[in-house]
Amino acid sequence: MTETQTAPLTDTRIMPVIHTLFRRELRLVGGLLRSVTAGDTARAAVVADHLDLVGTVLHHHHTAEDDLLWPLLLERVPDDLAPIVHLMESQHGRVEQLLGDITPLLAHWRRTAAAAERDAMAQLYDELYVALAEHLDAEEQRLLPIAARSMTQQEWERMGEVARAGTPEGQQFVVLGMIAYDGGPEGVALLMHGAPPPVRWLVPRLGTRAYRRHALRVYGTATP
């Protein structure tokens, strides 16, 4: 490589596509919870299962970043990362604090469908959405450009593999459909990058179908 040549940027475009899942689902949670009639434990269980799924996907997404993204960037480009380290840490901390507050309430509400717990959780989820949206915006605007020039494509894709491995058994197509819902054709193409043509054709359709069924059960509509 000559002095005028530079390494190609790593393609990080999939990250904002994945973030659409969290933005949409968490934006809807407050209203979803408040719509559950007090004492309706059957409905509470459906909603709680959905919130558990979204929370699990978010947890593994952040864990993969914490384990594979941050240590590598801090080692390679500490000066580039310095201006945003404290911001990202404080935002992550706030998100984890809210999730920690929600977890015991959700476990109890699943069994009781009590109005007080429902309303407390709805408020916490409203706060979580605001905190997470702020964090995702900062990550996309400030962190991804650093990652694109500091990581190899293999390192970047490894992080995605680790995050996906945490998807609950039997929910892979639902989660794929959640991501594809707002991702559009370009997002679906990024999700399926490198897959054989039959897989690129079939899997997104299975994901869309699975999320439609899931959304009908959770929201009462296939297009929440």
Could you say what each language-model-derived stretch is?
Residues 1-224:
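Small-residue-biased structural context
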